[in-house]
Amino acid sequence: MKEYIAEAEKDLLHTYNRYQIVLDKGEGVHLYDTDGKKYLDFVAGIAVFALGYQNKAYNDALKAQIDKVIHTSNYYYNVPAIEAARKIKKVSGMDRVFFTNSGAEAVEGAIKAARKYAYLKDGCTDHEIIAMNHSFHGRTMGALSVTGNPKYREAFQPMIGHIKFAELNDFQSVLDQVTDKTCAIIMETVQGEGGLRPANEEFLKQVRDLCDERDILLILDEIQCGMGRTGYMYAWQRFGVKPDIMTSAKALGCGVPVGAFMMKEKVAQHSLTAGDHGTTYGGNPLACAAVEKVLDLFEEDHIIEHVREVAPYLEQRLNELADKYDCIKERRGVGLMQGLVFDHPVGDIINRALEKGLILINAGADIIRFVPPLVITRENVDEMIAILDTCIE
């Protein structure tokens, strides 16, 4: 394993603070390194592997598509993209879909759609977007510009212009930023990197009403919190606060790089048209075959029902841990997107857990994030808690 790490350090750009293991294969909710060591995975590729590793039906669908065609071009139609779009419309309630290669690309498309929508209304080119402090939407320039964390933005100024920031769950702070030039409000329905902070029902409904009154587009980023993780296919469905534009990725492809931004018909009819936006690989047959099969398996395997059964148990066990240790300030989160907030940095705890065969990740310096495969069991939760308990002691 050490020789692989040495080679990577020599050849790869140093943009990640990687843990000192080399992962080689997965099975169910477990990963194995190149030395054969087994790990219980409560990260799932950062909320990606909803179905776990080596799901046979999923793998078979990808193999079958590889044997047909992997990529064509968006100058032509392909059946997997048509079927995937139909199925994602059904579960999301949105009207139009654009497939991308990643979540960041989906956010870029959402921003462009909102600005074009506003431009067609009044011809102005100085429209404003309101985003949330502590948010994270991606590292491309547009997505970074609406990311409300200065540490990600500082070295890459100037950002795209006319972006303002408000506080999640503080409606007055949003009102304070609204002007006649506001074209969109963007937020994660549950903030991930920002500390597992859910937008509450009252706030979401107030923002939705404001957007309706002022013809402002509401963009909800469901890249991490979507695809069943909160016990609903998309987190906004908990409260019925439907966005005008929505982004999705991560578990949408369960390992195959794919994202999407979706919109209501009123936005689609008055925003992006031919030549406004495009992608070489987005919507390719292989990625869309993955999306299609993921959505089928969510229904066939009753994934959301399972999340609703196991998530309360995870919350209970995390609450017990929080009650046991004074250094844990609180538990936050929804469904299988949880966090424990500590009064000190959590890096050492995560490293000790890794040594004991448990994969965890942080969300900021003082929060351990839990975003496991959606197929985990109560027994997996118990095993995780037992290991984590020994790492905190």
Tell what function each PLM region has.
Residues 1-393:
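Conserved N-terminal phosphate-binding loop of PLP-dependent enzymes in the Aspartate aminotransferase
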